[in-house]
Amino acid sequence: MSNSDSSSPLPESGRIAHRAKAADQTGWGRWLPGLRTLRGYQVAWLRHDIVAGLVLTTMLVPVGIAYAVASGVPGIYGLYATIVPLLAYALFGPSRILVLGPDSSLAAVILAVVLPLSGGDPLRAVALAGMMAVVSGTVCILAGLVRLGFVTELLSKPIRYGYMNGIALVVLISQLPKVFGFSIESEGPLRDVWAISTAVMDGESNWTTFMVGAGTLVVILLLKGNKRLPGILIAVAGATVAAGVLDLAARAEVSVLGSLPQGLPAFAIPWITTTDIVPVIIGGCAVALVSFADTSVLSRVYAARTRTYVDPNQEMVGLGVANLAAGFFQGFPISSSSSRTPVAEAAGARTQLTGVVGALAVALLLVVAPDLLQSLPTSALAAVVIASAIGLIEVTDLRRIYRIQRWEFWLSIVCTVGVAVLGAIPGIGLAIVIAVIEFLWDGWRPYSAVLGRAEGVKGYHDIKRYPDARLIPGLVLFRWDAPLFFANAELFHDRVLEAVATSPTPVRWLVVAAEPVTSVDVTSADMLAELDETLHASGIELCVAEMKDPVKDKLKRFGLFARLGETAFFPTMGAAVNSYLQTHPVDWVDWEDRVR
């Protein structure tokens, strides 16, 4: 048994944090989890949070700048998008140690909107990205308030892997020109690959720039698994010092970050033109989906580690407020970070004070020493983004999915190809469409079975799996393994009639084993009424067994309960069979009777 730090905010042994406890929170405590944490803050946590915040700062600065450039805005705005959102999330976010900020998973989505609309104007790019953050934040807050925190759970794991792998490829491709030291007109991922290859073959590469970028990438990847050595900090600092000492900007035309403006981000409304509204709204909604999908997964992982409960709806609100803060303080869309959060955890973070310390440290850098990173090569920043994109790519679990459920693997591949070929935003739209189709397909063609009595086995079982199971003369027991709704109502109707038609004896009763049926909608209720008419015309009585009370309540509202009659509903399959045998004399001896 492991020994946990006594100062760590964990519940007592034998207890599990759950939404039932979270529901007890009312008033300001519910909407401002940061205040709740502050009221219960322990002095013993302070040292851990301060140290973790300072360690985190070494990641926040280079990564924030790198992801800003990857998103199509000047690097300084990556630091702006780090400071205020961290402070906002500390107040509104429910997770104790989750770190928010610019992220590589959003870079491709932001760039897809900013690049074609900005026309190369950096201020216009900042306004577009800022308004995307406002849209994303508004969507997240509204979704959280109406309790739609479950919505990303509708995206299956293979589909999430698919579009994230696609986004990783798009991000990686977009950074290659910076590594090679030239620029191209982006026309989509596939065309960009061709343009990059052509430029390299034509000798447009700056090989000094390439060596700096490649060297930075190698150092980051080599130190990635080392918790004691901050790989990104070492690689970026090394590249910056080398570029400054050797004066690579002047001698080898290596592109560098340049001077950063001194001071803190100011409140500013990101004004855009009317022609930008539609693409910005679409892009903002795509950002909201991707960022919350990432944040909800990461939040649950760390909540499980700290044995705390995180309300997904409040998580959505916290993420939304952080994005609003980013949008109105010269930032751009942000998300949780799967690279910075582990750094905070490993450094001993206890609460969101870690993020507050990190934000204040970044702010101090901008006020006191903004020129510290002026010699940072842009190829090194590209290497940081590429390393993060490589980390987004999921291969191991896809291999497992390929072994156990091949068709879901191919859905994932389709999503990856869709993002890589169509671009980030259309690709995400494709992933959503595929998720809806997958959901409907599973419910549209569920498993169904005719049940029989197997020798020596209690209950009634699928005659396909128990070929020796006997059928009761005149009685069809039909099981439907799914909710009944508009997409599968007609299929249910057809399969029931097929079961009746293939019965070896004339059918008198048809009993639906309804325990797996968790819901019924209006379309399927109307279908059941039509089915009852069809069966009744043939002298067959429709009965239902083991139906759950909430589903039965729906049938009462739809008028089906009165139509079929209370006597048509049975609590168990055994009760239905016994009632049939009592009213219909048939040649039937149960194996349990023979045992007696």
Please give the residue ranges for each predicted region.
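Cytosolic C-terminal regulatory domains/tails of membrane transporters and channels
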Residues: 1-32, 444-596
